[in-house]
């Protein structure tokens, strides 16, 4: 499907065959129709969902600044850039019209550069978000001091600068060239392709390093941090007493899981400094159980989505690296041809499902998202600023929202 850096060599057929056959590309019509439908669906849902996510974030600027907003914006912009540039180019020049490459040398380099840039920006943004959440859960006092919107902006700026640097080599090793020549020695215009300009050995080294840096290490870090966070959530749930229990010791981490929850801790410390014994009443009700379980499930889902969508993509690239040139049979080559299309489809699916993850990790974002979607459909509803959660009654329990902010404990809840 693609005569490029990740397309294995194939023995040259007879010169009497068609150009596509001579260049080793022959996609069946049913596959073209099927993947066109899949690409079109991914493009429509992904661009609409991520554009609406950006709209929600920008529309909520009047609200209290929150760190989640910047993470959502970074991930949505990365997904939009990937879908808007890569999907149309690949659908035209890699699915339907393999030769000649029509987007020029700059388009060739830009296509691969943007794809690598967005891949790095996405996985590094997810890793940074997981690191912030882990710190907020495990070290709430330190998180209160370190995790500010300004520092989050700087962190994400660093993520994008690093992504630019890491993706730059792809714009150097890729380029446009002619695969065939005429009888008079001039390049065959119809054989113009977007392909690799360095040796295959150099490309193999680059791919292996790229898979390690853009997938294995960031995803391992994300899984490790999310695992720590999930373990803390499970421990917190097991430590919550029954509805009739009262605790006379220092507030547990359940009260300190969010930035706003620290106000209760400070008030508790001030009460102790006056020589008064403080006691907080906490309840193990159904809503609290659901909240903790939901938080753990979301963290697992984030890792699962990127493993399912990205692992086949990188496995296919490594497949190219580890199979020698003389090991490519016609059957293996045909398998790789269609495996390429399947893995790229999954790769783009990860960008299309990011709005679903946003809605899963933040109830306030979900409310704004649905309100914006309803307004576009003609239903006018009131809009609340992101990322503030809906107010809770004073009799409710200390609820924990992994991505939102629980309410502050009131003075009336601190029994003297």
Curated annotation (Swiss-Prot):
A lipid is attached at residue 377 (S-palmitoyl cysteine). The chain crosses the membrane at residues 33-55, 65-87, 110-131, 155-176, 218-237, 298-318, 338-358. It is found in: Cell membrane. Belongs to the G-protein coupled receptor 1 family. Neurotensin receptor subfamily. NTSR2 sub-subfamily. This is Neurotensin receptor type 2. It is a multi-pass membrane protein. PROSITE patterns: G_PROTEIN_RECEP_F1_1 (PS00237), G_PROTEIN_RECEP_F1_2 (PS50262). InterPro entries: GPCR_Rhodpsn (IPR000276), GPCR_Rhodpsn_7TM (IPR017452), NT2_rcpt (IPR003986), NT_rcpt (IPR003984). Keywords: Cell membrane, Disulfide bond, G-protein coupled receptor, Lipoprotein, Membrane, Palmitate, Phosphoprotein, Receptor, Transducer, Transmembrane, Transmembrane helix. The keyword Disulfide bond applies. Residues 1-32, 88-109, 177-217, 319-337 are extracellular. The modification Phosphoserine is found at residue 410. It comes from Mus musculus (Mouse). SUPFAM superfamilies: Family A G protein-coupled receptor-like (SSF81321). Its main location: membrane. It comes from the Eukaryota. One of its GO terms (cellular component) is membrane. One of its GO terms (biological process) is phospholipase C-activating G protein-coupled receptor signaling pathway. Disulfide bonds join 108-194. It holds the Pfam family 7tm_1. Residues 56-64, 132-154, 238-297, 359-416 are cytoplasmic. One of its GO terms (molecular function) is G protein-coupled neurotensin receptor activity. Receptor for the tridecapeptide neurotensin. It is associated with G proteins that activate a phosphatidylinositol-calcium second messenger system. Expressed maximally in the cerebellum, hippocampus, piriform cortex and neocortex of adult brain. PANTHER family: G-PROTEIN COUPLED RECEPTOR, NEUROTENSIN RECEPTOR TYPE 2.
């Amino acid at each position: 499907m693609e005569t490029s850096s990740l397309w294995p060599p194939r023995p040259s057929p007879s010169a009497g065959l068609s150009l596509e056959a001579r260049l080793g590309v022959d996609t069946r019509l049913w596959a073209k129709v099927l993947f066109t439908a899949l690409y079109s669906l991914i493009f429509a849902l992904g661009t609409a969902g991520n554009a609406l996510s950006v709209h929600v974030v920008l529309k909520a600027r009047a609200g209290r600044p929150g760190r989640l907003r910047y993470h959502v914006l970074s991930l949505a912009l990365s997904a939009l850039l990937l879908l808007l540039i890569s999907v149309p180019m690949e659908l035209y020049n890699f699915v339907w019209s393999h030769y000649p490459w029509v987007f020029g040398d700059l388009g060739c380099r830009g296509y691969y550069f943007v794809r690598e840039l967005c891949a790095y920006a996405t996985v590094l943004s997810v890793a940074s978000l997981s690191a912030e959440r882990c710190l907020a859960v495990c070290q709430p006092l330190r998180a209160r001091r370190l995790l500010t919107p300004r520092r989050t902006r700087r962190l994400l700026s660093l993520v994008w600068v690093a992504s630019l640097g890491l993706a730059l080599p792809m714009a150097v090793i890729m380029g446009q060239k002619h695969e065939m020549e005429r009888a008079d020695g001039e390049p065959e215009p119809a054989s113009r392709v977007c392909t690799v300009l360095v040796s295959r050995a150099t490309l193999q080294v680059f791919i292996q390093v790229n898979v390690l840096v853009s997938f294995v290490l960031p995803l391992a870090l994300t899984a490790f941090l999310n695992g720590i966070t999930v373990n803390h959530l499970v421990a917190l749930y097991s430590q919550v007493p029954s509805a009739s229990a009262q605790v006379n010791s220092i507030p547990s981490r359940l009260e300190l899981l969010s930035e706003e929850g620290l106000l209760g801790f400070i008030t508790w410390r001030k009460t102790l400094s006056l020589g008064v014994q403080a006691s907080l009443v906490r309840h193990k009700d159904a809503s609290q159980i659901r909240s903790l379980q939901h938080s753990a499930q979301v963290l697992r889902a984030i890792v699962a989505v990127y493993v399912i969508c990205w692992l086949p993509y990188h496995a296919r690239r490594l497949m190219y690296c580890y199979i020698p040139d003389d090991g490519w049979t016609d059957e293996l080559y045909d398998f790789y041809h269609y495996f390429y299309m399947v893995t790229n489809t999954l790769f783009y699916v990860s960008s299309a499902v990011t709005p679903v993850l946003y809605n899963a990790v933040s109830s306030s974002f979900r409310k704004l998202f649905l309100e914006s979607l309803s307004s576009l459909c003609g239903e006018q509803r009131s809009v609340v600023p992101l990322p503030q959660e809906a107010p809770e009654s004073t009799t409710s329990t200390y609820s924990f929202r992994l991505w939102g902010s629980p309410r502050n404990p009131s003075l009336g809840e601190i029994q003297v």
